[in-house]
Each structure stands twice: as C-alpha cells, then as structure tokens.
A protein has these predicted regions:
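PLP-dependent aminotransferase-like
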Residues: 214-269
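Helix C-cap/helix->beta junction micro-motif
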Residues: 241, 297-298, 459
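Active-site phosphate-binding strand-loop segment of PLP-dependent enzymes
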Residues: 257-306
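Flexible glycine/proline-rich, aromatic-decorated loop/lid segments
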Residues: 307-311, 320-330, 355-375, 453-478, ...
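Active-site C-terminal subdomain of aminotransferase-like
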Residues: 315-438, 442-448
Length: 579
C-alpha cells in the first residue's frame, strides 16, 4: 500500500533525471555524481559543526574586521593600555622589591630564605587572615598548620608513582578516597582518586566518560550537557579532550538547572549530564534527583560537581539543615567531584573524584603498554604526584574528625543565613535565589552593584564580581516570596528601579574565617554604610577597574575579552627585562 503511494512520484522523478542526463556521456555522469556527493558531505560538515554556524559567522566577521588597519590600530592601542595596566598592578603589589631572575652564584642561607618568603607573603592589599576575603582561604588555624608542617616534612619527598617505595602514601590516598566515598554514600563498588584540585577532578571525569562512551557506545563526537552556571573547568575539558559542551539555561527565579532545557538538548552523542551542589555564581543547588532521573531515562551518566561545597553539603543534615538528596544515594548519579582543599580545610592542591563503579574509573586511567621503558600507567594527569600534599590532606581529615566538620559546617551555614537575612533588609539590595550552603549572590535594581564592590574594596574587602545573568527577566521578590526569609520585607519599592542594574552581581563565599571575631557583623555594617552613601546618587555609573570589567561583558567580539584575560595571565609571570 505504502509503495504504491510513492510509485507515481518516483516515476516522475526518474523521468526527470533521465531527461537531464540523456545527452551526458558516462564519464560526465560519474563526475557529476562524485562531485555532488563530495559537495554534499562538505556542506553537511560545514554546517553541522560543534560550534554553530551563527557563532562561527560572527567570529569570522570580527576577525576580518580586525584586519582593517584603522580598526586594528585602535584595538591594539587599547589592548596595549590594558596590558600596561596589568603590569603596573603587579609592580605596585611587589612594593619595589628586586626580582631574582638568575640563580645566585652562592646559595642563600636558611635564615635569608625564610625572611625572603615572609617578605613575599606580605605583598597584597587584603587581610585574608582576618576574614576580609570571599572564598580563597577556607580555614586558618595555627595548631592545624603546625600539624600539617610536621606531616609535610615527613612526606615531602614521597611520590605515589612509586608504590613499592612509598606504600604508606598510597595507603593514605586510598583512605582519603574511601572516607570521602563513604561520606557521599558510595556503595562497596564506589571508587576514585585524589587530584590536585577541582579542575583536575572535573577534567578526569570528562576524560573518563569520553573514553567510556567511545569504547562502549562507539560515540566519536561526544557532547556534555550542563547548566550555564556549571564551572568553566567543563569548558576546559571540552577544549582539552575534543568534547562539545552544551550549556542550557537555568530558571531565572531560583537559578537552578532547567530540566526541560537539558532534556531538549540530549542527543545520540550525549555522554554526560551535570549538576552542581552548589554552583559558583549563585550558590544555589541544582535538582540532582531530577537530573539523575533524566540520566536513567536516557541511559546517560550523571556527574555531581560538589567541588565548591562538597564538604559542607555532606555534613549539613547532621548540622541540622535538611537538603534534597544529591549524592550516590540518588539512583543514576555515577560520579562526584569534591575539593578537600576548600571546606575539607586541607592545604591547597587536593581534591577527590569519585565514581559509583570501577568501570568508569578504568577509563580515567592512562595506560601505555608498548613503551621501551616498561608498561606505564597513571591514574590522573600527573605522573609524579606530591606525596606530601596527599599526607597533609589525610592528616587534616583525620584531625578534624566527623564532629569537627559538623561543627564547622554549622557555624558556616549559620553565618551565611545571618548575612543573607541582614542583606535582604537593606534598602536597594536583593539576593539572587536562595543560598543553599555558603554563597550569597548580591544585586541591586537601583544602582550598579559594582559600585558597592568597589566601595567595599576600599574598606579592605575582596568580593567576586560576576557576569551574564540567566534570562532576560530579573528577580521579582513580590512574585517569589519564598526567596525572602520570614519576617523580612523587601524594600525595593521605596526607590526608583533602573532597568539593567539587576543584571549585575557580586557574591560573597562565606568561609570559616567569617564565623569568628565579629567578621560577619563588620561586613554587614560596612555594606549598610556604603549602600547608604551610594543611594545618595544611585544613578552614578561605576568607574575604575570594575568599569573595565563591566565594559568587557558588553563587547560583542569575545576574542577581545579573551585577549584581556591572556594579558592578565601574562602579568602574573611578569619579571623586568632590564634587571
């Protein structure tokens, strides 16, 4: 029946083609056919690349525009000024001290070196030991530092690359992984490795799933789907490993992953779905149960990025705060990344990547069987790894104990809720979403929030400016009363709201440093005083360095913004050429 329906159309098509080619010689027909097929394949590949045709078109247009001499000179002139600004900042922070650019002929003494280190560590404008910094340093205690110094002294030259020589360090790493897996309700088959930080943990997870999908499902063009609020380490993994990263929007009121958007983005090449607990920009938690359900429905692994708040969320229930399920207790969650060097309070350079089953971890490993030097295998990016850092991480966890972590979590979350509540009471401010753990994203509808960040910097505070809010709509507290704590009335109706200001944000990442010595009260008081001053002229625009940061978000040619960033990174390695 079906074939008879298409038969007349096919006959017409056949007659048409035969008529067009009736006067062609066989070699011409073969040439036309081959050329048409090759052109079709090329056109398909050109249109359906990892990067959209529109995005590539914009980049090409901007790249060609930058080749116009007048435009190129103007852009290069401005970039040179920015580069010079970054270098001057580094020079100023160095406080006029000379650089060591060649190895000294005679080595310096122990005393000289220690004094130099003390001098170097005094550079900088922010008193992080007194809690003036958002994130960065999550715990500081002289007794713990003494313990870690002793431990690192003992293990400083150890390397788990040589398990026969340093089996004790390998045992410590295995114990860190198992302790962490148990905290995240991993079963007997759960496993993992330590890494040097959250970025490497995420890189390893992406590499593992890429190789797993290639081996088990034959996927050659892998894609990972994640909310736009996910950490840029996933984008780095995409660049490193040739994985297409598909960003999906978040709910513009609660700032959680839009599950329907993630569902629509799934394709036959999807190898991983990602959720955060919490995300960095807003401090809100994605609905891991819903993401995991999506993963089960389509047989796609699910990664939970708990790098930022992992060592808070696992203790929050015991600290008296209920959270939705987010770990291996949720069916469908196949991996979790968590930083021990953040709220695990270990020294910098340690994180953990966990898997629900060894089959995923096996694809994280790199194995070379035909090297003349022998069979080579390494669990993470690095071959040699610092055994001293592994030992220090192990010592931190064993020293704190469960009770210590629960107590620290309770203090941090209590402080976060206090700051959140008090900031909502300030005329002209609002909070994005509902902070799940320790991150508070602050905005204003009546003045540019970067002005507050700049003002607080003059008082010694260091906050994080953020960019690109989700969606075109701005938070409306009256339509989302659940975002406002009980008894707190938003005061935004008392002032003129200026469209666009609510799209800018800064955030405070509360650490253990903010729970002591009245730090939270000092922060709130400084915010109240500076907002009162700003409200005298709320329409004034931001200036200084933050103005440049804000301006960069409006530049359509993102390659120029990339140049800004590269110059900033270059400045970190500045040394004088005339010394």
């Amino acid at each position: 029946m079906t074939s008879s329906l298409f038969k007349p159309g096919f006959e017409h098509f056949k007659i048409f083609v035969n008529g067009c080619l009736c006067d062609k010689e066989p070699w011409q027909i073969v040439t036309l056919t081959t050329t048409s097929v090759l052109a079709g394949v090329w056109l398909w590949g050109f249109i359906f690349q990892e990067e959209s045709l529109l995005s590539r078109g914009k980049k090409t247009a901007f790249r060609l525009a930058r080749k116009i001499p007048a435009i190129a000179r103007r852009i290069d002139s401005e970039l040179d000024k920015i580069n010079e600004t970054f270098e001057k900042e580094v020079i100023n922070r160095n406080q006029g001290n000379p650089y060591i650019t060649t190895i000294p002929d005679k080595g310096k003494s122990h005393t000289e070196i220690v004094e130099l280190v003390k001098q170097y560590l005094k550079f900088g404008d922010f008193k992080w030991e007194e809690g003036y910094v958002s994130g960065a340093v999550y715990y500081f205690n002289t007794d713990l530092i003494k313990l870690l110094t002793d431990v690192y002294t003992l293990a400083s030259y150890t390397n788990p690359l040589h398990p026969d020589i340093f089996p004790g360090v390998c045992k410590m790493e295995a114990e860190v992984v198992r302790m962490t897996a148990n905290l995240f309700h991993g079963g007997p088959s759960s496993c993992g490795t330590m890494t040097t930080g959250g970025t490497e943990s995420i890189l390893m997870a992406c590499k593992a799933y890429r190789d797993y999908a290639r081996s088990e499902w034959g996927i050659k063009h892998p894609e990972i789907i994640l909310p736009t609020t996910s950490h840029p380490a996933f984008d780095k993994a995409g660049l490193y490993f040739g994985i297409r990263i598909t960003h999906t929007p978040v709910d513009p009121v609660h700032y959680k992953a839009d599950i329907n958007a993630m569902r629509r983005a799934i394709s036959r090449n999807t190898i991983l779905l990602v959720g955060s607990t919490p995300n960095f920009p807003y401090g809100t938690m994605d609905d891991i149960e819903e993401i995991a359900a999506l993963g089960r429905q389509y047989n796609i692994p699910v990664h939970v990025d708990a790098c930022l708040g992992g060592f808070l969320v696992i203790f929050m229930e015991q600290a008296g705060y209920k959270l939705p399920p987010f770990d291996f207790s949720v069916p469908g969650v196949t991996s979790i990344s968590a930083d021990t060097h953040k709220y695990g309070f270990a020294p910098k350079g340690s994180s953990v990547i966990l898997y629900s089953e060894p089959k995923y971890r096996h694809h994280q490993f790199c194995v070379t069987t035909d090297w003349p030097g022998g069979v080579y295998g390494s669990p993470t990016v690095n071959g040699s790894r610092a055994g001293g850092i592994i030992a220090a991480c192990w010592a931190t966890m064993v020293s704190f104990g469960l009770n210590g972590y629960v107590d620290a979590t309770k203090k941090i979350v209590e402080t976060t809720k206090l700051i959140d509540k008090r900031l909502r009471e300030i005329d002209g401010l609002f909070i994005f979403g509902s902070p799940a753990t320790s991150v508070i994203a602050i905005g204003s509808k009546v003045f540019h929030i970067y002005r507050l960040s700049d003002a607080l910097t003059t008082r010694g505070w260091n906050l994080n400016p953020l960019q690109y809010p989700e969606g075109s709509s701005t938070p409306t507290l009256s339509s989302a009363p659940d975002l406002v704590p009980a008894g707190v009335q938003p005061n935004l109706h008392q002032v003129t709201q200026i469209p666009g200001y609510a799209t800018w944000r800064i955030h405070l990442c509360v650490t253990y440093m903010h729970t002591t010595n009245g730090v939270a009260d000092r922060f709130i008081a400084d915010v109240e005083e500076e907002v009162a001053l700003i409200m005298k002229d709320p329409s004034k625009e931001v200036d200084g360095k933050l103005a440049m940061y804000g301006m960069s978000q409006k530049i359509p040619d993102r390659s120029i913004v990339g140049d800004f960033t590269r110059f900033f990174l270059d400045s970190m390695y500045y040394t004088p050429t005339d010394q």
